């Protein structure tokens, strides 16, 4: 009997990288593998994508794990470095780093490095989280251009705040600021992440940075799924039935008795709960697949178990397979039902969920 297991489909991952090349044919791709590759496993994901032009991570520790795992492709520190003492390691490991504030710039100017570092100056075009403000950007850029520890030319990166809202006008404004600053500068440019790749072809530039869409999940919250863009789900969260029970009409189920059956039926108990990372907020009616057919969750999600209404004539039995999301049941549907973003669902599975890679 299978306990909670997440299946990672390597073939789908490779397919998605190729599909993104088709969507952004003039761009090189930074495969974003931060946060344990969005819950898919950092090292195995990178090893599955040897043709990625580079990898993007949030922390130096992630980059060093990739290097220790044999990954030799360029690795970009999307948040830059946190301490000046990190710079010798960044140089020695040939990492690329974002630079987005005065403290980082001063650290670069003062460092004693054996080799210069490839730098991506982060321009704040409207996200207002990290980055150099446009009115300060030219002077910042000139200092980077004159810094002995920076491999020239300086590259320029930014990030969209509302790429998933094509009617907002915010993305066009960010693009205008980005294009104005980059004009005449020789470095590489990058602003498009998943939403930019899908909706804003004019933003693809030299490098694009696919994140969640690389894993077959739509970054948009408009009812679309990764399949709508030609991508395949890489992660399937699976488990099995551990019991099947007869249940009488009028009887409640689970903590608080929040669901009461209107008919005699058969209930299945699934070895999955919020202790595995499944959302406790999932309401009755949230779908799962049992033996390939859709059935609803009933009652509250518990730490270790959920109950599903199999139907009065169901022939399912203990040990039968269950898919909570993934192949045949897009995680975007679960996100819509639970009001928990797909980003959070796929990255928050706990350590007791086994991970298995399949082709």
Curated annotation (Swiss-Prot):
Q: Which UniProt keywords apply?
A: Cell shape, Cell wall biogenesis/degradation, Isomerase, Peptidoglycan synthesis, Pyridoxal phosphate
Q: Catalytic activity annotated for this protein? A: L-alanine = D-alanine
Among PROSITE patterns, the record links this protein to:
ALANINE_RACEMASE
CDD domains per UniProt? PLPDE_III_AR_proteobact
Question: Per the UniProt entry, what is one GO biological process?
Answer: D-alanine biosynthetic process
Q: Is Cell wall biogenesis/degradation set as a keyword in this record?
A: yes
This protein's source sits in the domain of life called Bacteria
**Known cofactor(s):** pyridoxal 5'-phosphate
| Residues bearing PTM N6-(pyridoxal phosphate)lysine | 34
| This protein's GO CC annotations | cytosol
Where along this sequence does the record place binding of substrate? Answer: 129, 303
Q: Which GO terms describe its molecular function?
A: alanine racemase activity; pyridoxal phosphate binding
Q: Which family does it belong to?
A: Belongs to the alanine racemase family.
Task performed by this protein: Catalyzes the interconversion of L-alanine and D-alanine. Provides the D-alanine required for cell wall biosynthesis.
Under which name does UniProt file this protein?
A: Alanine racemase, biosynthetic
């Amino acid at each position: 009997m299978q306990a909670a297991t997440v299946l990672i489909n390597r073939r789908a991952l490779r397919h998605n990288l190729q599909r993104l090349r088709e969507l952004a044919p003039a761009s090189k791709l930074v495969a974003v593998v931060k946060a344990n590759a969005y819950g898919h496993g950092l090292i195995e994901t990178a090893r599955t994508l040897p043709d990625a032009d580079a990898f993007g991570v949030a922390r130096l520790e992630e980059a060093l794990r990739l290097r220790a795992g044999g990954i030799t492709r360029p690795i970009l520190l999307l948040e830059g470095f946190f301490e000046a003492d990190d710079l010798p390691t960044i140089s020695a490991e040939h990492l690329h780093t974002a630079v987005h504030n005065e403290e980082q710039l001063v650290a670069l100017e003062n460092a004693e490095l054996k080799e210069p570092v490839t730098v991506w100056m982060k321009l704040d075009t409207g996200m207002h989280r990290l980055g150099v403000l446009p009115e300060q950007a030219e002077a910042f850029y000139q200092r980077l251009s004159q810094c002995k520890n920076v491999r020239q030319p300086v590259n320029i990166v930014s990030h969209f705040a509302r790429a998933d809202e094509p009617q907002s006008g915010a993305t066009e404004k960010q693009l205008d600021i980005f294009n104005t600053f980059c004009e005449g500068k020789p470095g590489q440019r990058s602003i498009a992440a998943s939403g930019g790749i899908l909706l804003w072809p004019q933003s693809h530039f030299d490098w694009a940075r696919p994140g969640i869409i690389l894993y077959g999940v739509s970054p948009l919250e408009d009812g679309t799924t990764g399949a709508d863009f030609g991508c395949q789900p890489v992660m399937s969260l699976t488990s099995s039935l551990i019991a099947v029970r007869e249940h009488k009409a009028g009887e409640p189920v689970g903590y608080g008795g929040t669901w009461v059956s209107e008919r005699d039926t058969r209930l299945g108990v699934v070895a999955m709960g919020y202790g595995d990372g499944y959302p406790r907020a999932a309401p009755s009616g949230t779908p799962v697949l049992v033996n390939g057919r859709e059935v609803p969750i009933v009652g509250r999600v518990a730490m270790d178990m959920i109950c599903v209404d199999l139907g009065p004539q169901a022939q399912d039995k203990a040990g039968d397979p269950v898919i909570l999301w993934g192949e045949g049941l897009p995680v975007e549907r679960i996100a819509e039902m639970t009001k928990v973003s797909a980003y959070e669902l796929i990255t928050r599975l706990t350590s007791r969920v086994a991970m298995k890679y399949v082709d």
